[in-house]
Amino acid sequence: MALTKADIAETLSDKFGFNKRESKELVEQFYDEMSEVLVKGEQIKLSGFGNFELKDKSARPGRNPRTGEDVPISARRVVTFKPGQKLRAQIDNYGTA
């Protein structure tokens, strides 16, 4: 199961009493803010959860796995996520209780 924006908005509505429209707008604003920060090349640090960061990957040679043909892989920017200690601990301990 995947957690969607709609799921997050519904949880906000249920737990905090926001109406559906308000909770959807709040989630959209949060995603927009995160996107804007990353596009500017800045980090997002969510305490206890983890960090999102934009990294530049340089061009490099690659290979088509079907044909074995050499193919250039162009330079690009990627978003990376590094989980925080609390999240790592929760994941490590999942199902062991």
From Swiss-Prot:
Pfam families in alphabetical order: Bac_DNA_binding
GO biological process, one term: regulation of translation
PROSITE patterns found in the cross-reference section: HISTONE_LIKE
Keywords annotated in UniProt: DNA recombination, DNA-binding, Transcription, Transcription regulation, Translation regulation
GO molecular function: DNA binding; structural constituent of chromatin
GO CC, any one term: cytosol
Gene3D superfamilies xref list: IHF-like DNA-binding proteins
Superkingdom of origin: Bacteria
Record InterPro entries: Hist_DNA-bd (IPR000119), Histone-like_DNA-bd_CS (IPR020816), IHF-like_DNA-bd_dom_sf (IPR010992), IHF_alpha (IPR005684)
Signal sequence bounds: none
Cross-referenced SUPFAM superfamilies: IHF-like DNA-binding proteins (SSF47729)
SMART domains assigned: BHL (SM00411)
Subunit structure: Heterodimer of an alpha and a beta chain.
Cited NCBIfam families: himA, PRK00285.1
Role this protein plays: This protein is one of the two subunits of integration host factor, a specific DNA-binding protein that functions in genetic recombination as well as in transcriptional and translational control.
Family stated for the protein in its record: Belongs to the bacterial histone-like protein family.
HAMAP family: IHF_alpha
Name used for this protein in its record: Integration host factor subunit alpha
Naturally occurring in which organism (per UniProt): Hydrogenovibrio crunogenus (strain DSM 25203 / XCL-2)
